[in-house]
Amino acid sequence: MATAASNPYLPGNSLLAAGSIVHSDAAGAGGGGGGGGGGGGGGAGGGGGGMQPGSAAVTSGAYRGDPSSVKMVQSDFMQGAMAASNGGHMLSHAHQWVTALPHAAAAAAAAAAAAVEASSPWSGSAVGMAGSPQQPPQPPPPPPQGPDVKGGAGRDDLHAGTALHHRGPPHLGPPPPPPHQGHPGGWGAAAAAAAAAAAAAAAAHLPSMAGGQQPPPQSLLYSQPGGFTVNGMLSAPPGPGGGGGGAGGGAQSLVHPGLVRGDTPELAEHHHHHHHHAHPHPPHPHHAQGPPHHGGGGGGAGPGLNSHDPHSDEDTPTSDDLEQFAKQFKQRRIKLGFTQADVGLALGTLYGNVFSQTTICRFEALQLSFKNMCKLKPLLNKWLEEADSSTGSPTSIDKIAAQGRKRKKRTSIEVSVKGALESHFLKCPKPSAQEITNLADSLQLEKEVVRVWFCNRRQKEKRMTPPGIQQQTPDDVYSQVGTVSADTPPPHHGLQTSVQ
């Protein structure tokens, strides 16, 4: 079996030296771990001999006098049982799921763990059961040269189980193959019992999580040094405000709301409460693919996730508001005596946004898009306020409106002058520039007025003439009389129609 020294995630056997997974037994008694469980609970003391004072035991001496110590030892069995059903991956050591179990669920977990111990040939160590069945058993190698490794076979299994707890990559494929030939029937019973224990643990834990119960008391919480996450992967200690940075991968990591533990019970309570709201779904049965995520840096789920967006849609008007404003704006504009072009010009001069008369017209008719209506409404509202405040006194709006109204006065031509222009048009519909100048001087009109009158007269003639008939002048009619051929109709018919 693999040892902690061969694990790539634990260089220099620093994890075992940190003492985060196992707890030191100050008494140093050989059967101390087994006596606290009651009913085959002492896993690390299976070697038979007494452990050294520096060796590690699964259960800590601080829990022996406490009635909850039975649950702690049962949680050790649950750890091995759930690890066997999870393909060799241990979830955590005495995590809050098992410590928060009711006594009935804990008793069921102990019974299932006892069945696992009786049926499994590797029942010498509760932690050793976490070994993957995919690897055949090997003779225990010599103990590593660490300062705290002094045990025998039980210690080797303990190191092996701890090392397998940190190994990677995870098993995401089909279920593990049948057990080794040397151990017939051992892992089949273990898997069945582990499945029952896992179901009991989940059934007991999920209602308590959904009910929003208080986190377990301080005596049921393990104090864990900084730098370790729930998965057992190494990570940077969470900084101030880092909160859950060890999860790293978010939903891709096997971090359940009830599994996160911090340095103090207050921090653990914070994680328990916050992750319950941030990730209400049950944990995924597999680890995430890829290397372990190193936390540190930003907290996985900060309080900003549940905070409400301060930006609201209160400032955005509704369609009814826009319709009501457009109606009022049109009434006020007409009452003040401004045209739509005046408003567009005033907006461009006052606020820097030039709008045409067409845009103002479409706004009043509610023919603009909702987005453009919302953009134009505050500008028109400001213009209305400015116009209302300046009523009765000439202000900049009146000056701008006066500039917008600048257009040439319509020219009125007398009847006698119009008759002279008509007679000249019948003679020559397209006078030259010199003829226009002479005619303007004789009629005492501007040259531009005469030119525009002839242009308008030609357009009027085109509208009055059907499109299929070519307009003919009297000169053209008389010129066609001398060129009549034998197969053409008599010219007097065309002449009579032209004259009439």
Swiss-Prot record:
One of its GO terms (molecular function) is protein homodimerization activity. One of its GO terms (cellular component) is nucleoplasm. Brain. Residues 314-388 form the POU-specific domain. Pfam families: Homeodomain (PF00046), Pou (PF00157). Changing R407G: In SNIBFIS; no effect on nuclear location; no effect on transcriptional activation function; no effect on homodimerization. Keywords: Developmental protein, Disease variant, DNA-binding, Homeobox, Intellectual disability, Neurogenesis, Nucleus, Transcription, Transcription regulation. SUPFAM superfamilies: Homeodomain-like, lambda repressor-like DNA-binding domains. Residues 270-287 have a biased composition (Basic residues). Residues 406-465 bind DNA. Residues 32-63, 122-190, 231-319, 461-500 are annotated as: Disordered. The keyword Ribonucleoprotein does not apply. Residues 468-486 have a biased composition (Polar residues). It is found in: Nucleus. Residues 32-52, 241-251, 293-303 have a biased composition (Gly residues). Changing R362L: In SNIBFIS; no effect on nuclear location; decreased transcriptional activation function; no effect on homodimerization. GO terms for biological process: central nervous system development; cerebral cortex radially oriented cell migration; chemical homeostasis; forebrain ventricular zone progenitor cell division; metanephric ascending thin limb development; metanephric DCT cell differentiation; metanephric loop of Henle development; metanephric macula densa development. Residues 134-146, 171-181 have a biased composition (Pro residues). InterPro entries: HD, Homeobox_CS, Homeodomain-like_sf, Lambda_DNA-bd_dom_sf, POU, POU_dom, POU_domain_TF, TF_POU_3. Belongs to the POU transcription factor family. Class-3 subfamily. PANTHER family: POU DOMAIN, POU DOMAIN, CLASS 3, TRANSCRIPTION FACTOR 3. Homodimer. It is linked to Snijders Blok-Fisher syndrome: An autosomal dominant neurodevelopmental disorder characterized by global developmental delay, hypotonia, intellectual disability, autistic features, impairments in speech and language skills, and dysmorphic features including abnormal, cupped, or prominent ears and ocular anomalies. Transcription factor that acts synergistically with SOX11 and SOX4. Plays a role in neuronal development. Is implicated in an enhancer activity at the embryonic met-mesencephalic junction; the enhancer element contains the octamer motif (5'-ATTTGCAT-3'). This is POU domain, class 3, transcription factor 3. It comes from Homo sapiens. The gene is POU3F3.
